[in-house]
């Protein structure tokens, strides 16, 4: 995320600009922020997580989405998570097809330029999404994933730090399991 806001906007202004833009921007509060590009490793990690979830979710009524589909928070903030999972029917505000409001899982792959933002303000805003059950934060430089889960009292808890090639992440809300070894093996040889 760029450190300088482009301008102060309404959500409607943001959507008009974003839908015509040649690059992606996120909307936080009343500010629009241009997104920085990702590395080859970042792209591979996100792609491999997407592929694994896609294979496991076929026929389940749920599906993973790439960072081309925005997620909207109840406050109107809009983000492009690296991967999100939605279950049918996904809810599109005002009939829009490029944004939805009810993700179940959000995956962010950290990068040096976005790590503080992804774990800070963005995660605070993600937690406001009522349908969200899990948020996974993949580190780009080591086999390490932080798994945050919504608790029955609506609080969020760091469920586990997953380390190493044998680590597995259980996602009971979508009945999936992610094996970290194969995901990271397909990404770590790429520049990061």
Task: Identify the function of each model-found stretch.
Residues 1-192:
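Gly/Pro/Ser/Thr-rich low-complexity, intrinsically disordered segments predominantly at protein N-termini
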């Amino acid at each position: 995320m760029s450190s300088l806001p482009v301008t102060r906007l309404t959500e409607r202004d943001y959507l008009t600009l974003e839908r015509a833009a040649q690059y992606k921007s996120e909307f936080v509060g009343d500010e629009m922020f241009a997104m920085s590009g990702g590395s080859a490793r970042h792209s591979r990690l996100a792609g491999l997580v997407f592929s694994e979830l896609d294979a496991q979710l076929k026929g389940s009524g749920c599906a993973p989405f790439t960072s081309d589909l925005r997620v909207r928070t109840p406050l109107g903030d809009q983000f492009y998570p690296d991967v999100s999972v939605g279950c049918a029917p996904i809810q599109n505000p005002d009939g829009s097809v490029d944004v939805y409001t009810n993700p179940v899982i959000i995956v962010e792959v950290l990068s040096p330029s976005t790590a503080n933002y992804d774990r800070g303000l963005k995660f605070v805003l993600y937690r406001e999404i009522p349908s969200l059950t899990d948020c996974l934060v993949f580190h780009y430089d080591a086999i390490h994933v932080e798994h945050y889960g919504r608790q029955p009292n609506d609080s969020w808890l760091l469920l586990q730090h997953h380390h190493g090639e044998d680590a597995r992440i259980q996602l009971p809300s979508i009945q999936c399991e992610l094996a970290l070894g194969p995901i990271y093996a397909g990404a770590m040889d790429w520049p990061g």
